[in-house]
């Protein structure tokens, strides 16, 4: 597990990995600035030398709102993976909270298929948000 700040000092770990699972918070309908900076930093060597070609990729995001345009963040991650010729793997869970007999404790409660999405109330700390189902 690497933060984006750590990742830029450990390219060898990412280059040697069979899969890279990426995650970043969604702010204002987009990936966070530090993650975007990480993405841009891959263009000089990883992209130019196709070091991630053929790797498995997956991703997740978390935001303060139930919707919050998190789909856009997942699409950014998928596009980034595709630019590196990686193979994206979706969430693989059926839709969650879309029936009268389900609740917020069900997996994939916000019903995304491209990747994992979480929601954290902005007035609560990380000890309680996001909920364990996310």
Predicted segments with their positions:
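Short, glycine-/small-residue-rich phosphate/pyrophosphate-handling segment
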Residues: 53-111
